[in-house]
């Protein structure tokens, strides 16, 4: 479950601008602020099922965006490559540049 939550959080970070304000609100509250479906439904005065359906559709949309754009998978690859590169050298200046590259993401 934690792996799924972590993945959805990353996908949300990458693709949230492609979502509607309502989708962003539900996802932020559910995944980032740890609201329950019931709490979200009370705040927006909709059924718990409506919130659940919206979140599930949004998750599917995020996965669809990732299938097409690969932003998250490329990010993961960059992180792994930078870690390998860091292990290959003890040069302080190279480590500083590696950190600068990491900070760009």
UniProtKB/Swiss-Prot annotation:
Superkingdom of origin organism: Bacteria
Function: Might take part in the signal recognition particle (SRP) pathway. This is inferred from the conservation of its genetic proximity to ftsY/ffh. May be a regulatory protein.
Gene3D superfamilies xref list: Winged helix-like DNA-binding domain superfamily/Winged helix DNA-binding domain
Pfam families (UniProt xref): UPF0122
InterPro entries documented for this protein: RNA_pol_sigma_r3/r4-like, UPF0122, UPF0122_fam_protein, WH-like_DNA-bd_sf
NCBIfam families the record matches: PRK00118.1-4, PRK00118.1-6, YlxM
Protein name: UPF0122 protein OB1530
PANTHER family cross-referenced by the UniProt entry: UPF0122 PROTEIN CBO2450/CLC_2298, UPF0122 PROTEIN YLXM
Family statement: Belongs to the UPF0122 family.
């Amino acid at each position: 479950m934690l792996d799924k939550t972590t993945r959805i959080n990353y996908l949300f970070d990458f693709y949230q601008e492609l979502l509607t304000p309502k989708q962003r609100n539900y996802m932020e509250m559910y995944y980032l602020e740890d609201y329950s479906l019931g709490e979200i439904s009370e705040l927006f005065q909709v059924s718990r099922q409506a919130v659940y359906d919206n979140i599930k559709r949004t998750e599917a949309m995020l996965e669809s965006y990732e299938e097409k754009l690969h932003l998250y998978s490329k990010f993961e690859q960059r992180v792994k490559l930078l870690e390998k590169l860091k292990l290959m050298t003890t040069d302080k200046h190279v480590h500083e540049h590696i950190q600068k590259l990491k900070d760009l993401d």
